[in-house]
Amino acid sequence: MKKLGFLSLLLLAVCTLFACSNQKNASSDSSKLKVVATNSIIADITKNIAGDKIDLHSIVPVGKDPHEYEPLPEDVKKTSQADLIFYNGINLETGGNAWFTKLVKNANKEENKDYYAVSDGVDVIYLEGQSEKGKEDPHAWLNLENGIIYAQNIAKRLIEKDPDNKATYEKNLKAYVEKLTALDKEAKEKFNNIPEEKKMIVTSEGCFKYFSKAYNVPSAYIWEINTEEEGTPDQIKSLVEKLRKTKVPSLFVESSVDDRPMKTVSKDTNIPIHAKIFTDSIADQGEEGDTYYSMMKYNLDKISEGLAK
């Protein structure tokens, strides 16, 4: 009996110690800055700067369209609890069904106090024939120089909210900017070597304007932005007629859109689809393109490869 009593006390002590340890860890985790990012690209850039210093939640799932999204209860909860929220801005989450505008309003969050546009400072490009607020092209991250601006804005806000980890954020930012800068330089050299008559990136959505400007590669598309009609017969006909006047060797289709319209274009022009590329999302974890850096490297490699045919 004494032996049983001793074992019971020992078991109780171990359980108590384990519970206290878990409580301590939970308390430690709860002390971390709670950060929400609207999509996988912004979340990955944030992760590269913050590492394990924050508790990070990404709203729009990998592979989904961030233009028009319906937040889940978990997204609403995390946004309400967040110390800091990062969104793209320039008409991405606030255009279309304006899902982000509704989300932060319901969570009683204030702009430039609780939530910040990571695109602040980007040289904005507008939709074709437009130059007014609400008509911006949101895909600024497809220019690596803008990706660097995103990273700098994220680091700035993290330091403001969490000055105790300033040294970590600054160190990680420096290393990340150097990495993106090297890839940007490599990209410019690659596209300089492609013959001008072959230089045109053809995609479903007209989301490569920033890419085109940065790397001197004109773009063409079926529809301009995912909030409008996608892949109508007139849109397809217009692109087919344009391509028949060119020597473009390859077409591309985005990983987050229906590939059927581009397959029709390919059939009607006899121009092959060279590869799927990334635009609004990174890849699933463990797959090629599962970070912002690797997504951009994959795109640059596939596009230059396809146009060099």
UniProtKB/Swiss-Prot annotation:
Pfam families: ZnuA (PF01297). GO terms for molecular function: metal ion binding. It is found in: Cell membrane. Coiled coil: none annotated. Gene3D superfamilies: Nitrogenase molybdenum iron protein domain. GO terms for biological process: cell adhesion; metal ion transport. One of its GO terms (cellular component) is plasma membrane. InterPro entries: AdhesinB, Bact_metal-bind_prot9, Lipoprotein_PsaA-like, ZnuA-like. Changing residue 20 to G: Loss of acylation. A divalent metal cation binds at residues 67, 139, 205, 280. The keyword Flavoprotein does not apply. Keywords: Cell membrane, Lipoprotein, Manganese, Membrane, Metal-binding, Palmitate, Signal, Transport. Residues 1-19 form the signal peptide. CDD domains: PsaA. A lipid is attached at residue 20 (N-palmitoyl cysteine). It is a lipid-anchor. The keyword Lyase does not apply. A lipid is attached at residue 20 (S-diacylglycerol cysteine). Part of an ATP-binding cassette (ABC) transport system involved in metal import. Binds a metal with high affinity and specificity and delivers it to the membrane permease for translocation into the cytoplasm. Also acts as an adhesin which is involved on adherence to extracellular matrix. It is an important factor in the pathogenesis and infection. May contribute to the formation and accumulation of dental plaque. Homodimer and homotrimer. Belongs to the bacterial solute-binding protein 9 family. Lipoprotein receptor antigen (Lrai) subfamily. This is Metal ABC transporter substrate-binding lipoprotein SsaB. It comes from Streptococcus sanguinis.
